[in-house]
A protein has these predicted regions:
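Active-site glycine-rich loops that stabilize anionic/oxyanionic intermediates
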Residues: 12-15, 76-77, 111-112
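Conserved alpha/beta-hydrolase fold motif
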Residues: 72-73, 106, 193
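Gly/Ala-rich beta-loop-alpha elbow adjacent to hydrolase catalytic centers
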Residues: 73-82
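Flexible "cap/lid" loop of the alpha/beta hydrolase fold
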Residues: 91-138, 143, 208-209, 257-275, ...
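Conserved serine/cysteine hydrolase catalytic core
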Residues: 171-233
Length: 316
């Protein structure tokens, strides 16, 4: 089996796989990279969340069948796609694995930790945020906020304008339907989370809450943050690549992985490691409070799940 895993990149809503090109150019000399083209961003309002998951699983399957392990890297909406696509590809806990490769890790970028059986918009009770609206006539989600402000406010104007020109349509069906195909794959593999402090699309406080929730629910989460917009793979590709190399080395859990991937020359001081410092009260508010809320949410979800299982057994 090849030693190095393949990276499978999943883009977010409205984005083509080419949004990762700059980042992939930095990574490909050391790791094989493939990017998923989401059917729900291909101009078909009938495309579904299941179609996106199937597209991601198809690429994962190609790699694992050839004996390669896989690390899934997903941005924004792509997080629920990437996490769901892990189903059936992680190593089994009882050791009865089939031959071939497996998904060995998940890296989320400005995204969230989804729940099994919960559609993308379910946590928002079906109400879209002010940044986009439901267009029932076309079947697409229409961006209302100026896209540069939403995604790329820290890019030079010319590059931001180009990136805006590359945005495409987003099927509503993927956002509101398909909950039966949503799967919390992040509970099956270790994960890394790359947060975005200056994000105007997904507030960093919400990101920190999501990390706290996942940890409370038993997930293994390494957390890093960058002082960027919603798209760090464009505004800070070298730092994003640095974190990815560090994560892959951890997923491989070997000296070989560390020697290959941790020698990247980048400025580590720009990478934030969120955590509490006893004599730095600001960290209590920046990190402690939102993560504590997340942990309470995670505990509530676990309690609800436990009561639901108990009720189901009692009603049989």
């Amino acid at each position: 089996m090849p030693n190095e895993p393949t990276l499978v990149f999943v883009p977010g809503s409205w984005h083509r796989p080419t949004c990762y090109d700059t980042l992939i150019e930095l990574i490909e000399p050391k790791l094989k990279c493939v990017a998923v083209s989401l059917p729900t961003t291909a101009g078909n309002p009938e495309a579904t969340f299941k179609d996106d998951v199937d597209a991601a699983q198809e690429l994962i399957s190609v790699e694992t069948r050839s004996g390669r392990d896989v690390v899934v890297i997903a941005h924004s909406y792509g997080g629920i796609v990437g996490s769901s696509a892990i189903k059936g590809f992680a190593k089994s806990k009882n050791g009865s694995d089939s031959e071939g490769g497996h998904v060995i890790g998940l890296i989320l970028i400005a995204s969230g930790y989804n729940l099994t059986g919960v559609a993308f918009m379910d946590p928002f009770f079906g109400h879209p945020p002010p940044s986009w609206r439901v267009n029932k006539e076309t079947g697409y989600a229409d961006i209302v906020t100026p896209p540069r402000e939403f995604f790329y406010h820290d890019l030079p104007q010319s590059e931001a304008e180009y990136r805006v020109s590359q945005l495409t349509t987003q099927s509503l069906k993927a956002l509101f339907e398909g909950r039966e195909y949503s799967y919390a794959g992040w509970r099956d593999v270790p994960s890394w989370y790359i947060g975005t402090v200056e994000d105007r699309g997904l507030p960093v406080l919400a990101q920190r809450m999501s990390v706290g929730m996942a940890r409370e629910m038993g997930a293994s989460v390494e957390h890093r943050e960058l002082q960027t917009s919603h798209s760090p793979f464009l505004s800070q590709p070298a730092l994003t690549a640095k974190i990815i190399f560090e994560a892959v080395a951890a997923f491989m859990d070997s000296d070989n992985g560390k020697s290959i991937f941790q020698s990247q020359e980048t400025e580590n001081s720009a990478i934030i490691r969120p955590g509490l410092a006893l004599f730095q009260p600001l960290t209590w508010f920046k990190f402690g409070i939102p993560m504590a809320f997340g942990r309470l949410l995670g505990r509530g979800i676990l309690l609800y799940s436990w009561v639901r299982r108990l009720w189901s057994r009692g009603s049989r």
